[in-house]
């Protein structure tokens, strides 16, 4: 008889039940090695469309394709066994109609095996979120600063500084909650607003540049370990700097190759003795 203990994967229902409890730990993951490292630590692994910038070198997330998200999402699901895996829906894949959103979200879930999808938007997406959740697709919403709408918003800036803007964000939070989202990312939103809506709505809020009062926090893993330094948002805390470590390893390798000291005998195959 096998004594192997099967690890239970965290579900969207588990995430929703964490409202007001121990804060949720969320990080992005795009590749198999990172997913394996983060899986025991994180409640949610978010396959973010930020991969367009940190993996593919794009200037924004707007050119990320559905195929990219599916490929990376599948790798993260295959390489994790505990965390709830959520995949971002890229720009243009869900805004046209409820039917388009369902078709593409269903494809992402079927081809990746993820637990849920994430959509950016508030009141304008409430009908779509309801359409999806009624048909068995769990949705994580995303309000406040929405990177996919950065051009329409006039660039990256903190949201909610004026009362009309703050009330719009609170209205978005109420709308996506009523539509059936199981959680919501609150990005780049002034702390009093993020704190107030976290207390008001019944689903977990996951902050990024919002407030410690949110029900969880998310960061981009490449920001956290210093691998992405094209720019560093105010809300990023760098917990490690791997760039000099990787650079030093590559420099040492290059020096040994040029000196013909690598590969050494221990790294080569010899002829079998007769």
UniProtKB/Swiss-Prot annotation:
Cited InterPro entries: Pantoate_hydroxy_MeTrfase, Pyrv/PenolPyrv_kinase-like_dom, Pyrv_kinase-like_dom_sf
Encoding gene, per UniProt annotation: panB
Statement: the UniProt record of this protein carries the keyword tRNA-binding: no
EC number: 2.1.2.11
EC category: transferase
Names of the cofactor(s): Mg(2+)
Swiss-Prot/TrEMBL catalytic activity: 3-methyl-2-oxobutanoate + (6R)-5,10-methylene-5,6,7,8-tetrahydrofolate + H2O = 2-dehydropantoate + (6S)-5,6,7,8-tetrahydrofolate
Residue numbers binding 3-methyl-2-oxobutanoate: 49-50, 88, 118
GO molecular function: 3-methyl-2-oxobutanoate hydroxymethyltransferase activity; magnesium ion binding
Cofactor binding note: Binds 1 Mg(2+) ion per subunit.
Subcellular location: Cytoplasm
Binding site for Mg(2+): 49, 88, 120
The protein's annotated pathway: Cofactor biosynthesis; (R)-pantothenate biosynthesis; (R)-pantoate from 3-methyl-2-oxobutanoate: step 1/2
GO biological process entries: pantothenate biosynthetic process
Known partners and oligomeric status: Homodecamer; pentamer of dimers.
Disulfide bonds: none
Organism: Paramagnetospirillum magneticum (strain ATCC 700264 / AMB-1)
CDD domains for the chain: KPHMT-like (cd06557)
Gene Ontology CC annotations of this record: cytoplasm
Function: Catalyzes the reversible reaction in which hydroxymethyl group from 5,10-methylenetetrahydrofolate is transferred onto alpha-ketoisovalerate to form ketopantoate.
Family statement drawn from the similarity comment of this UniProt entry: Belongs to the PanB family.
Pfam families reported for this sequence: Pantoate_transf
Name this polypeptide is given: 3-methyl-2-oxobutanoate hydroxymethyltransferase
Record keywords, A-Z: Cytoplasm, Magnesium, Metal-binding, Pantothenate biosynthesis, Transferase
Active-site feature positions: 187 (proton acceptor)
């Amino acid at each position: 008889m096998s004594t192997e203990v099967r690890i239970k994967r965290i579900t969207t229902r588990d995430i929703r039940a964490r409202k007001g409890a121990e804060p949720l730990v969320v990080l992005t993951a795009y590749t198999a090695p990172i997913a394996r490292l983060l899986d025991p630590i994180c409640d949610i692994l978010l396959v973010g469309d930020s991969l367009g910038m940190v993996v593919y070198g794009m200037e924004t997330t707007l050119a990320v394709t559905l195929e990219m998200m599916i490929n990376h999402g599948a790798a993260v699901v295959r390489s994790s066994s505990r965390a709830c895996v959520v995949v971002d829906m890229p720009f243009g894949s869900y805004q046209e109609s409820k039917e388009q959103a369902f078709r593409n979200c269903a494809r992402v879930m079927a081809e990746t095996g993820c637990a849920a999808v994430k959509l950016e938007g508030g009141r304008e997406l409430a009908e779509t979120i309801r359409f999806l959740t009624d048909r068995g697709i769990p949705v994580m919403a995303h309000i406040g600063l929405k990177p996919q709408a950065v051009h329409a918003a006039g660039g990256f800036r903190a949201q909610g500084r004026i009362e009309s803007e703050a009330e719009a964000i609170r209205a978005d939070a109420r709308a996506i909650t009523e539509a059936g989202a199981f959680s919501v990312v609150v990005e780049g939103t002034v702390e009093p607003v993020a704190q107030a809506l976290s207390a008001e709505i019944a689903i977990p809020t996951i902050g990024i540049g919002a407030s410690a009062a949110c029900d969880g926090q998310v960061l981009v893993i490449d920001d956290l370990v210093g691998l992405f330094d094209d720019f560093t948002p105010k809300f990023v805390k760098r917990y490690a700097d791997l760039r000099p470590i990787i650079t030093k390893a590559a420099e040492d390798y290059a020096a040994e190759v040029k000196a013909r000291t690598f590969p050494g005998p221990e790294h080569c195959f010899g002829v079998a003795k007769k």
